[in-house]
Amino acid sequence: MMRPQWIIAALLLPGAALAQAQDKEVRIGVLGLFHSNQIVVSPIAGQPLQCRTGGEPWPVVEPMRAELEGTKIRITGTENAFDGTIFCDSGASGATEFVASIPGKIARRYSGKLEIRPDLRELIAVVVMPMETAVASVVAAESPPHAPMEALKAQAVATRSFFLAAKGRHHDFDFCDTTHCQFLRAPPGPATAAFNAAAATRGLVLIYKDQVLAAMYSASCGGRTHTLAELGLPDHGYPYFAVTCNYCRRRPEKWVTQLKTEDAAALAPTESSRLNLARKLGWKSVPGNSYSSHAENGSLVLEGVGVGHGIGLCQRGGADMARHGSSFLEILQHYYPNTEVKQY
C-alpha cells in the first residue's frame, strides 16, 4: 500500500458490547471526494434492484440518474423531485449488488444497500454493507500487491477491529471510503486472496484489556514503529508500543523531498503537522514521520524512511514475516504487543 495514511484514532469498544456486534452492518459513505450533485445507480445482471422514497418501490432495470435539485432529488425521466432519502436494495433480502458512479469521474461496484440523500450542494451516498463484505473490500484495497495469506489475515483482523471500535467517525455515516478511515474499493470475488483472508478470520478482533482495539496500521514503518506520544497523538487506551521491524530496518523504503522555507516553517514532528502539509502540497510532500533534515540552497531537504504514520501494523514488515513462516497471530502479536485475538 503506497497511499499515505491519515490519523486513525485508537478508539475502544467496551467488552460488554462484543456480544451485540455479531452480524453487524457497516455504514460507509462512498464517492464523497467528488462532492457531486448527481449519482448514477446501475443494476447488475442477475441482481434484483429496487428503490423507494417512502412509498411504493420501483424496479431499477437500467441506469438511474439521481440529481440534486434545490433541496430535493430528481430521478431522470420522472416528473417530480423527491424529498428526503432514496433507499435502494434487493427488496426481499435487503443487500444486493449494483454500480454507483459519478458521471465522467468514477464507477464502482458495491454489495449492500444504498442510501442517497440531498445535502447543501451535493448528494450524499451511503452503502450499508455486511461487516465481512466491508472487511474483505478493505483488505483488497489496503494490502500491498502479492501479500502472503497470513499477512492478509492479519490485515483482516486489524480492519475488522477498526470497524467495530471506531464507529461514528462521520456525522452522516460511520466511515468514509478513503484512508481517513479505511480505503475501500469493490468487494473482491470468492476466489480472491482478500476474500479468503476475511473468511478465514471471520469474527476475529484484537482485544486489549477486554476492549476491542481500533487498530492503526501503515504501509511501511522504516524499521521501527512509533508510539502515539512520539507523534503528538493522545493515548486512547492502547499505548502502541514501539517495536522493531526487521524487514524495514534491512530494506527501508527511502524517500527525499524538498520544502520551501515558508512550508518548512510549518513542519513539526507530529502526525497532524505532516498531514496539514500533505493536504497543502500533496501526499508525497512528506511521505512518512521518520526523517532527518538539512538546509540546502534556501530550502529544507528531508531524507526519510517509511510511508505513513508508522503506528501499529507495518504492512510491508508483516508481509515479510508471513513470507518467512509467521502466522497472522504472530504478526499481530509483534505489532500489537499485549493484545489478544478473540471472536467478537
Predicted regions and their residues:
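Conserved, single-site charged/polar hotspot
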Residues: M2-A10, L18-Y344
